[in-house]
Each structure stands twice: as C-alpha cells, then as structure tokens.
Amino acid sequence: MRRQKRDMFERAYLKGYRAGVSGRSKDLCPAANPQMRQEWINGWRDGRADHWDGYTGVSGIHRSPGIAS
C-alpha cells in the first residue's frame, strides 16, 4: 500500500484505466493537478481502447496494467 502512495502518477494512470474500461466519461477525472490529470487521461484512453476491443472482465486480465506486471 505504501508503494502506491509513493508513485501518484502511476496510481492516477491505473485509476483512469479502470474508469476507461468500465465505460465512464473522461469528464469525471478527479485530478486537479495538470500532470496527474494527464496521466489519468492517458490511462482512460488506454482503458477505452481495451473496452472497445473487447478486453473487459476476465478476457482483459492480461491487459490490465495493475495485475499483469
């Protein structure tokens, strides 16, 4: 858990990825810091691409950046 707190940009990317895969709008980005917002949007874009390609649920485990390292 402490490792997640150290790298806030990676955490923002992962949260954006999860939002994109689940189909949420990018307007829901919670980040106020411009750099963190950019990382969240990058994750959201990758998540949306995976969502459109059908990598959701169990079929997307190998694509999830938080699980498959």
Swiss-Prot record:
Keywords assigned by UniProt, alphabetized: Cytoplasm, Translation regulation
CC annotations in GO: cytoplasm
Location within or outside the cell: Cytoplasm
UniProt entry tagged with the keyword Cytoplasm: yes
Pfam name, any one: RMF
Segments forming a coiled coil: none
Highest rank taxon of the organism: Bacteria
InterPro entries (alphabetical): Ribosome_modulation_factor, RMF_sf
Keyword Cytoplasm appears in the UniProt entry: yes
Function in brief: During stationary phase, converts 70S ribosomes to an inactive dimeric form (100S ribosomes).
Family: Belongs to the ribosome modulation factor family.
HAMAP family: RMF (MF_00919)
Protein name (database record): Ribosome modulation factor
